[in-house]
């Protein structure tokens, strides 16, 4: 059995990263289908809360296997900077101001608030900020702003589900605008502070606050 030379190893690494990046974008499509099925109530909330972790776990897994580090996937604990705190505070206020006025109060469900809401917030950040954003950064290399915007566009499109319930397209576009702008904020903060932990916590808190409401038709 021949031993690969150093040059072969160097050549293989970019190829592995391109394949891993393509796989993560394919996972985004699968995750979008999964989210749409959940919006259409084809998946139960417990099932979706559990299955929703798979895209992030698989996405991070293929990136790490391709040679990206845990730091490049923002899977580390690091302090929250003042600027990062300011951005997260702005996202928190903006997101709740955008979604709560169109929600219908249903009352507190403690399992929904303290199990499903955190599960959704953490799983979304695991995929979008720790898998999709690093994949976009790998694809666009030095064009970091473009990569962050692209991952935010895909985060917005991930919320297309209401369109399949008959919601008018302009309203769906407005719905997708909220996660698009929030995604830019989360993406900036995660890159700035080098960790996805704070975005996971804040995203979960948004859904804890919103959990007593129902949205959509």
Enumerate the predicted regions with their spans.
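Juxtamembrane helix-loop-helix connectors linking adjacent transmembrane helices
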Residues: 36-52, 62-126, 133-134, 138
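Membrane-interface interhelical linkers
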Residues: 15-18, 69-76, 164-169
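Transmembrane helix-loop-helix hairpins at the membrane interface
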Residues: 107-217
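N-terminal, membrane-interfacial amphipathic/helix-forming hydrophobic leader that caps
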Residues: 1-70, 190, 208-217
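Aromatic-anchored segments of alpha-helical transmembrane domains
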Residues: 27-37, 92-102, 152-161, 204-213
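Select subsegments of transmembrane alpha-helices in polytopic membrane proteins
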Residues: 17-25, 82-89, 151
């Amino acid at each position: 059995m021949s031993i690969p030379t150093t040059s072969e190893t160097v050549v293989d690494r970019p190829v592995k990263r391109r394949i891993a990046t393509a796989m993560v974008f394919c996972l985004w499509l699968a995750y979008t289908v999964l989210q749409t099925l959940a919006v259409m109530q084809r998946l139960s909330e417990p099932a979706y809360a559990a299955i929703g972790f798979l895209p992030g776990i698989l996405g991070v897994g293929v990136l790490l296997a391709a040679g990206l580090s845990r730091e490049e996937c923002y899977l580390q604990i690091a302090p929250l900077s003042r600027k990062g705190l300011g951005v997260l505070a702005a996202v928190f206020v903006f997101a709740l101001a955008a979604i709560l006025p169109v929600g219908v109060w249903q009352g507190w469900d403690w399992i929904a608030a303290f199990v499903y809401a955190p599960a959704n917030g953490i799983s979304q950040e695991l995929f979008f900020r720790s898998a999709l954003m690093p994949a976009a950064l790998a694809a666009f290399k030095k064009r970091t702003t473009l990569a962050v915007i692209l991952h935010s566009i895909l985060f917005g499109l991930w919320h297309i589900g209401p369109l399949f319930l008959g919601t008018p397209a302009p309203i769906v576009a407005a719905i997708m605008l909220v996660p698009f702008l929030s995604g830019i904020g989360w993406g900036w903060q995660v890159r700035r502070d080098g960790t996805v932990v704070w975005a996971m916590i804040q995203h979960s808190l948004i859904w804890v606050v919103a959990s007593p409401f129902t949205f959509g038709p």
